[in-house]
């Protein structure tokens, strides 16, 4: 497919996302709002976009105010829609839930609307990350050439719709991206980096090459069967735990965007019990269960690469 055709599809798909989101928010406002609770988080400034988040202060919003914030959030796709001081790289998150009363017909209609939006968002993301054939570093410039100011994460981010929950509880999740590697796989990656002539700020080309050579030597000195692991921290994420009484099961969802909960009164469903979201404090995290971790030693800090002792 030509670049021109891909750009045409990219723009066309994005316009459909905008149109369907507008239709969804209009449709939701035609339904009876049973309960709404969302939690705004402090805006991340450009200066602090890479800083670790040790504390997050939460502000709760209820009822129609919460609904207004949520519906606006679903359509927040461009940096022009936010403060000039706010980071365009840090995700804009608004955990919470909107609960609407539906019957069988309106439930099916809303489910189809959300499913269509999520399909379009997934297709859009595939165009940018796969069909473009571009490395991650080049995608930002490519997308913004055709959609200036787009917040790509907000465009990719799908909506979560649930039916007839009994309880909804909110919390925080600390996660890591973990990938197990062999010694030879790491050596292969470092060899590719060594063959490149580029430098990485703040190092000069010579300093960067020297750093890579030292890393290569450190890995090459390990036994071939050494167990290596990348353990990269991900910024703390708001989550929602949903309990379904009839099925007697709990489901956990990432909750960067307000969940849409449909309460089908035709089936006798009632208003769910909704909890709050506490402020986040990294120094006071309570783990329900934390298994004993295998002793690991950090060997290449920039890659978050560890070796088992």
Curated annotation (Swiss-Prot):
It comes from the Bacteria. One of its GO terms (molecular function) is DNA binding. One of its GO terms (cellular component) is cytoplasm. This is DNA replication terminus site-binding protein. InterPro entries: DNA_replication_term_site-bd, Tus_dom1, Tus_sf. It is found in: Cytoplasm. Belongs to the Tus family. The keyword Cytoplasm applies. Transmembrane segments: none annotated. Keywords: Cytoplasm, DNA replication, DNA-binding. The lineage of its organism: Bacteria, Pseudomonadati, Pseudomonadota, Gammaproteobacteria, Enterobacterales. Its main location: cytoplasm. Trans-acting protein required for termination of DNA replication. Binds to DNA replication terminator sequences (terA to terF) to prevent the passage of replication forks. The termination efficiency will be affected by the affinity of this protein for the terminator sequence. HAMAP family: Rep_term_Tus. Coiled coil: none annotated. Gene3D superfamilies: 3.30.54.10, Replication terminator Tus, domain 1 superfamily/Replication terminator Tus. GO terms for biological process: DNA replication termination. It comes from Salmonella arizonae (strain ATCC BAA-731 / CDC346-86 / RSK2980).
């Amino acid at each position: 497919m030509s670049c021109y055709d891909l750009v045409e599809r990219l723009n066309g798909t994005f316009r459909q996302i905008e149109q369907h989101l507008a239709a969804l928010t209009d449709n939701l406002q035609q339904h009876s709002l049973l309960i709404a609770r969302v939690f705004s988080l402090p805006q991340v400034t450009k200066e602090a976009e890479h800083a670790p988040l040790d504390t997050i202060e939460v502000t709760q919003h209820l009822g129609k105010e919460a609904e207004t914030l949520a519906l606006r959030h679903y359509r927040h796709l461009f940096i022009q829609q936010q403060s000039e001081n706010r980071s365009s790289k840090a995700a804009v998150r608004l955990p919470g839930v909107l609960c609407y009363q539906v019957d069988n017909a309106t439930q099916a209609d809303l489910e189809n609307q959300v499913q269509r939006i999520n399909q379009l968002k997934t297709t859009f993301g595939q165009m940018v990350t796969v069909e473009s054939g571009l490395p991650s570093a080049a995608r930002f410039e490519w997308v913004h050439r055709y959609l200036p100011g787009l917040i790509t994460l907000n465009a990719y981010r799908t909506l979560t719709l649930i039916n007839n929950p009994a309880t909804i509880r909110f919390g925080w999740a600390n996660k890591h991206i973990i990938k197990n590697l062999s010694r030879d796989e790491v050596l292969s990656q470092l060899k590719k980096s060594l063959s490149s002539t580029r430098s990485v700020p703040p190092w000069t080309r010579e300093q960067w090459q020297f750093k890579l050579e030292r890393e290569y030597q450190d890995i090459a000195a390990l036994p071939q069967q050494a167990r290596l692991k990348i353990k990269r921290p991900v910024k703390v994420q708001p989550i929602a735990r949903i309990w379904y009484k009839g099925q007697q099961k709990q489901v956990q969802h990432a909750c960067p965007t307000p969940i849409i909960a449909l309460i089908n009164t035709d089936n006798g469903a009632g208003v769910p019990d909704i909890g709050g979201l506490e402020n986040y404090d990294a120094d006071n995290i309570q783990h329900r269960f934390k298994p004993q971790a295998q002793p690991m030693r950090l060997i290449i800090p920039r890659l978050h690469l560890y070796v088992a002792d």
